[in-house]
Design a protein with these regions (language model features):
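Short, hydrophobic/amphipathic alpha-helical patches that form generic packing surfaces
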Residues: 19-26, 207-210, 282
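N-terminal low-complexity segments that are often proline-rich with Ser/Thr-Pro
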Residues: 270-281
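N-terminal processing/targeting junctions
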Residues: 30-31, 244, 280-281
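Intrinsically disordered, low-complexity regulatory segments in eukaryotic proteins
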Residues: 2-11, 192-199
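Signature for HUH/AEP ssDNA processing cores
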Residues: 7-147, 154-170, 177
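DNA replication initiation modules
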Residues: 99-128, 156-271
């Protein structure tokens, strides 16, 4: 799978959009859009509908989207990504998108670890050390709020969500074994959150980075291990490495041990879900 290379801040918008779509590749037939309700103060993400607010077609506000017979998911296009990066849609309204990482065959092309509490700086630092020790490339993003972080793992092939989740669980387990005192209390979840898609569902979503307004205050951007924003976000993304076999194997102790999963859903610290094998490839 090729990667758009040699992109930097000075590259064309078309090149940036192409790179962004390659790295954050999930379901292409649907995306989520961030909403804010000024009256209730509520905010979140929901699947975008191609028929939203179309007169005579859209049932809002009297019919909920999930109950509307005219609901039609809007697909991801270059224009959707451009709107995300500039922070406004074609009508000038605020625009932030999220993607559904799990494809219909229950594989993913990226994964992430989400940290979202007061101890996130310490916890992220420890997990990053584990990742570096195991030789895995990772991209560290400060969250939209500035009060958390995502560790992104870009894959160079479609990999079963179950396999990816098991590998990331292993990274967390190794970190806890080496630093039991930290507890990883800020750890929130692995993305994708599920091993398999719920029947008729889309799975979880994740908000994408490089959101325009948060970016202006140093949030929703990629940072170095000291949490300092990188000067050229596009050059970093263009030169970022992908993993596939490495994530499957998660080598430890100089490559002598490899993660094997029982196929059961796992969670951090649930060590009964793993055993180790000294040789061979998965």
């Amino acid at each position: 799978m090729g990667r758009t290379e040699n992109i930097d801040n000075g590259s064309s918008n078309e090149e940036k959009v192409a790179l962004f779509r390659e790295l954050f590749f999930g379901r292409q037939d649907v995306y989520a859009r961030r909403f804010e309700n000024a009256k209730s103060g509520r905010s979140g993400y929901s699947p975008e509908c191609a028929n939203k607010w179309k007169r005579g077609v859209c049932g809002l506000p009297h019919v909920k989207c999930g109950q509307c017979g005219n609901r039609q998911f809007a697909p991801i296009t270059d224009e959707v990504v451009r709107a995300h990066l500039r922070g406004r849609d074609m009508d000038g309204k605020p625009f932030v998108m999220g993607v559904y990482p799990m494809q219909e065959n229950e594989s993913v092309r990226f994964a992430a670890l989400d940290f979202d509490e007061s101890s996130w700086r310490r916890d992220v630092s420890m997990v990053v050390k584990t990742v570096r020790k195991l030789g895995l490339p990772v991209a560290l993003e400060r969250s939209r709020s500035g009060k958390g972080a995502h560790l992104w793992f870009f894959l160079d092939a479609d990999i079963a969500a179950r396999t990816v989740r098991a590998a990331l669980t292993y990274l967390l387990t190794v970190t806890l074994e080496e630093h039991p005192e930290i507890g990883l209390s800020s750890y929130d979840r692995i993305i994708p959150c599920q091993d398999t898609l719920p029947k008729g569902g889309l799975g979880n979503l994740i908000a994408l980075p490089l959101q325009r307004e948060p970016r202006q205050v140093g949030n929703s951007v990629f940072v170095n291990d000291d949490l300092v924003p990188l000067a050229d976000q596009w050059a970093f993304l263009s030169s970022s490495s992908s993993v596939s076999r490495e994530l499957r194997e998660c080598n430890a102790e100089n490559g002598k041990q490899k993660l094997i999963t029982t196929g059961e859903r796992s969670s951090p610290g649930n060590r009964g879900r793993f055993f180790f094998h000294g040789g061979g490839r998965m």
